[in-house]
């Protein structure tokens, strides 16, 4: 047991803090107190009962995993997600007591990813980062995937753009012409300094930095379709299937890493980008944090016509995307879904309009453009947008209020 591991145990929450989280949860109270006491005694030289306590912690993880997967994720009680997250962290410690082999660290890394993706780690961010660093140290598991291609930079093409374009606008110009005017705008030459523009073309770089991490992947034509589903998969497997040198099997599903907080999960990738200064402009007295999302997939990924409630800056790193916009004033003419969970999504297919089924769509003024590498598209809140990738594509979006 190395000294660094013992130092990590110091970051585990004290029982007095956990007690407030699990108040009223009898099973979780018993197991987490036992686990916390065991690891506290470990620092004093005691190590009895580790196997039984570790088993109970694993059972607590499994029980709350089942609760999280019952019903819609948005309706899972926060306490369930917190218990799941901290139980995962304790499970990692007990697994590391058994072994710190590369394979064991890889298994622990997967558990930590699921704690972030399914649980709520906000109260234990310092512990999360320290565990990431410890598990990534010395490289968890050698990547056995076949080498991936390095993508060729796309040659910029002349394309029709139905909205204004601004070349590297100043903050003042952006605030006046875009933000305050509520005007969707294509911004040119604003992220040319990002290392991501050239580093991420080498898919082996992404494989090396993030290949062992687990992420949620969308499977199916788009999230509003009946056959759509999600799975948690290793990035290395996703990259191999969707970008590998071997031709894809006929009929293979398109997979999409969409709307994922990848940069919070893998800080090394965040070093390759930066939050554009435009995101500092706000109507709020105390602007909140900027939400940064990753969008990575092959040609043919589709986000159906939908809107977001926040200001949105969509930045294209590689590949290109065909985008169709519509104003908030046309909301009723776009036939939003009745479902609570799809209320911000239109029933129409913006790429293949069907005026017989949806006659009001004839009233809609659509705006089309091609988003190319290095471009940023500013979309004000509640502007509808349809997005389809024309080539293998990596985009980063910034949402703010």
From Swiss-Prot:
Keywords associated with the record: Cytoplasm, Hydrolase, Iron, Metal-binding, Nucleus, Oxidoreductase
SUPFAM superfamilies: Clavaminate synthase-like
Binding positions for Fe cation per the UniProt entry: 306, 308, 385
Entry EC no(s): 1.14.11.73, 3.4.-.-
GO cellular component annotations of the record: cytoplasm; nucleoplasm; nucleus
Reported consequences of knocking out the gene: Viable. Adults have circadian rhythms with reduced period length and increased rhythm power. Adults also display increased daytime activity and reduced daytime sleep.
Cofactor(s) this protein cannot do without: Fe(2+)
Name of the molecule in the record: Jumonji C domain-containing protein 5
Gene: JMJD5
GO molecular function: chromatin binding; histone H3K36 demethylase activity; histone H3K36me/H3K36me2 demethylase activity; metal ion binding; peptidyl-arginine 3-dioxygenase activity
Domain JmjC: 255-401
Bound cofactor: record note: Binds 1 Fe(2+) ion per subunit.
Subcellular location: Nucleus; Nucleus, Nucleoplasm; Cytoplasm
Protein's job: Bifunctional enzyme that acts both as an endopeptidase and 2-oxoglutarate-dependent monooxygenase. May be involved in regulation of behavior and circadian rhythms.
GO biological process: circadian behavior; G2/M transition of mitotic cell cycle; negative regulation of DNA-templated transcription; rhythmic process
Coiled-coil region: none
Catalytic activity: L-arginyl-[protein] + 2-oxoglutarate + O2 = (3R)-3-hydroxy-L-arginyl-[protein] + succinate + CO2
Tissues and organs where the protein is expressed, per its UniProt entry: Expressed in neurons close to the dorsal lateral neurons involved in circadian rhythm.
Lineage of origin: Eukaryota, Metazoa, Ecdysozoa, Arthropoda, Hexapoda
Methyltransferase in keyword set: no
